[in-house]
């Protein structure tokens, strides 16, 4: 990955609210299935904004920090996804998205961020991200002192 796109907590909340507004009316949804781990925080934000209390997870492992690897399903939510929103933080190459579509063919699959290779696999997303860009999510970063450039 050649570029980095840094996401702040404020940005994430703004994007999640935009997505939630597009998912109204909330009564059409039975619940949310958050893709662990990237979809957990966006899933909580959507649950809050839409007033949805039924939240489940599908646990899929496909990254080791910044390296993509083979997909492993560790835990899945029951059913075919009918009436459910499935949320992940982003769709990248589409590997996870294909697995989600296979597991939950009737779900409404959404992400906050989408790269070109994965865009056709989601029903909705908020922000376009170039394919060669790594996204730094706020839950992966800490706040630290940065000395002034002048050194004084």
Swiss-Prot record:
It catalyses: GMP + diphosphate = guanine + 5-phospho-alpha-D-ribose 1-diphosphate; XMP + diphosphate = xanthine + 5-phospho-alpha-D-ribose 1-diphosphate; IMP + diphosphate = hypoxanthine + 5-phospho-alpha-D-ribose 1-diphosphate. It is found in: Cell inner membrane. 5-phospho-alpha-D-ribose 1-diphosphate binds at residues 37-38, 69, 88-96. One of its GO terms (biological process) is purine ribonucleoside salvage. Guanine binds at residues 92, 135. Belongs to the purine/pyrimidine phosphoribosyltransferase family. XGPT subfamily. Homotetramer. PANTHER family: XANTHINE PHOSPHORIBOSYLTRANSFERASE, XANTHINE-GUANINE PHOSPHORIBOSYLTRANSFERASE. This is Xanthine-guanine phosphoribosyltransferase. The gene is gpt.
């Amino acid at each position: 990955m050649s570029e980095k796109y840094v996401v702040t907590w404020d940005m994430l909340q703004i994007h999640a609210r935009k997505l939630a507004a597009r998912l109204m009316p909330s009564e059409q949804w039975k619940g949310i299935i958050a893709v662990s781990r990237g979809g957990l925080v966006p899933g909580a934000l959507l649950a809050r904004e839409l007033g949805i209390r039924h939240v489940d997870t599908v646990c899929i492992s496909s990254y080791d920090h910044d390296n993509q690897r083979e997909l492993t399903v560790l835990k899945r939510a029951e059913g075919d996804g009918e009436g459910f929103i499935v949320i992940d933080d982003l769709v990248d190459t589409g590997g996870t998205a294909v697995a989600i579509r296979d597991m939950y063919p009737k779900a409404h699959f959404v992400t906050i961020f989408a790269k070109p290779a994965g865009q056709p696999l989601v029903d909705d997303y908020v922000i376009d991200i170039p394919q060669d860009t790594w996204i730094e999510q706020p839950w992966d970063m800490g706040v630290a002192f940065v000395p002034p450039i002048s050194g004084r």
